């Protein structure tokens, strides 16, 4: 059940991100994001990732709770996680464009690994999360491209 939930959340958030791009600029994928206010990047990212990465492992336990044991509760819970993960993808892509990477589609693969690492044993999950965190920590030392 958790694996199914993982795929629903990941692909749902990719569809939501593409829909947002289509509504705002007419294309499903774009690289012309305006520069993100970098001083708030880690704050936004921390909030959204904490919701996704802290709540998702509890999915199997939450199904025993009365408020999510219904079909409507489950659907609402999954929709909240989809929106949160879409926000993570949007912020991550904007951050990569902000440092000068022109086509950061591969970030969706990193997001897939981060979301999927919840299903892996603890040691493998730690390695994946720490390696991605190291990449994010190294990124601010790169030259910043002004996308105005």
Predicted feature locations:
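The cytoplasmic-loop to transmembrane-helix boundary for the fourth helix
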Residues: 104-115
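Membrane-interface extramembranous regions at the lipid-water interface
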Residues: 2-6, 10-51, 88-106, 132-148
